[in-house]
Every structure is written in structure tokens, then in C-alpha cells.
Regions:
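Structural signal for well-ordered, non-membrane alpha-helices
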Residues: 33, 37-44, 77-80, 117-124, ...
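Acidic interhelical loop/turn segments
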Residues: 47-55, 124-157, 189
Length: 204
């Protein structure tokens, strides 16, 4: 039986093994939402009125930080529910509404951090194969403006779920940098330090 997944390539002499959708998406969602939490906590420590950051935007026609945080969380929830062919729960619809209303009601830094922590807690409950059955299933992706896309689970993960997740995540990062919060590449890829060869770490 063909195993759906994206190939995970190891240097010789290891053999290639397929990476399942769960192995691809859930660690990605978790490590990047953890990073988002770190960015927000750094902003909270550096900026006197951190709550004011929630209303900050990159451009007048873009959603504020408050919305970007919530929509990044939404993408993680939505990816899981769509790939398991589940209806979107009321709590997710409420989070979407909270994000859409971020311009008028940006909320507080503490509330934004709570949304990130809630999403991480949800991801932590998933089984190691939680999404795998959805890899080859047909999936209908409907958008509010009436557009509908027909994909399978793998195409949805590659072409929509990850790109949307990173869009909102990176917009949040860019807003914080634009507001002079001190962040760097190490804050963005902090998960990579788990793989750092000790002898290559900078001295000091």
C-alpha cells in the first residue's frame, strides 16, 4: 500500500522514509506558535504599553497584530479539523470573529498570549497519526468571498495550510519588528537549537 506523505531525506547511509501529514504539520504548528509566544513575551518585556501593540499594523489595509495572532492560531486549528473532515467547532468560529474584529477590539497582550497557549494545548492532545487518514481524501476549501478549491489532503497542507499559517505568523513578526521590538533570526528559528552540533556553538 502506498503511504501518503512527503519524503524526509536523510544523508547517506540512511534510507528515505515518508513523513506523514501529522509529522509535518503538528511539530510545525507547535514550534512556530511557541516562537510566537516568545516574541509576544519579549514585546511585553520591552514595551511600556505592550497592549497598544495589539492595534499596530504594517499597512492601513492590513489586519492589526491582534488579528494576526488569532489567525495564526486559527490556521493550526483549522488544518487539524479539515484534515480530519470535522466541522469547525463553535469555539473556532468565535476565535475567527475575535480576529475579524481586531481592528475595533484589539484586546490585550495577555489575551493574545492566552490564545497562543490554548492553541498549543489543543495541539498537544493529538495522537501521533491524527491527520494521516486525510492525506489522500478529497477536500473542499470554501472561502467567504465565494471561491471554492478542490484539493486532496496533501495538496491542502502544502498549498494552503502552511502558507496561510506562515503568512499570519510572519506578519505578526514584522509588526513587532516595525514597532522596534528587538527580535532576530534566532527568535524565529529557535527550534533549530535542538539540532545544533555543540562544537559549532559560538563561544561566550
Amino acid at each position: 500500500m502506498k503511504r501518503h506523505g512527503i519524503l524526509r531525506i536523510f544523508p547517506f547511509p540512511f534510507e528515505s522514509t515518508p513523513m506523514t501529514l501529522t509529522e509535518l504539520l503538528i511539530p510545525t504548528y507547535r514550534q512556530m506558535l511557541q516562537a510566537l509566544g516568545v516574541w509576544l513575551r519579549k514585546a511585553e518585556a520591552q514595551v511600556e504599553d505592550a497592549d497598544a501593540l495589539m492595534a499596530a499594523r504594517l499597512a492601513p489595509d492590513m489586519f492589526p497584530l491582534s488579528t494576526q495572532v488569532r489567525f495564526a492560531c486559527v490556521q493550526a486549528y483549522e488544518g487539524v479539523h479539515r484534515l480530519r473532515h470535522e466541522s469547525m467547532p463553535p469555539a473556532l468560529e468565535a476565535l475567527l470573529d475575535e480576529g475579524r474584529n481586531g481592528g475595533d477590539h484589539p484586546g490585550t497582550m495577555a489575551e493574545a498570549l492566552a490564545r497562543v497557549d490554548e492553541a498549543l494545548a489543543f495541539l498537544g492532545t493529538l495522537a501521533p497519526d491524527a491527520l494521516d487518514a486525510g492525506a489522500g481524501r478529497p477536500l473542499e476549501l470554501g472561502l467567504p468571498m465565494g471561491l471554492t478549491f478542490d484539493l486532496d489532503g496533501e495538496g491542502y497542507a502544502r498549498d494552503w495550510a502552511l502558507s496561510q499559517f506562515y503568512f499570519h505568523l510572519m506578519t505578526a513578526y514584522a509588526i513587532l519588528r516595525n514597532q522596534r521590538v528587538e527580535l532576530g533570526k534566532a527568535d524565529y528559528v529557535q527550534h533549530m537549537f535542538a539540532f545544533l552540533r555543540p562544537a559549532t556553538a559560538p563561544a561566550g
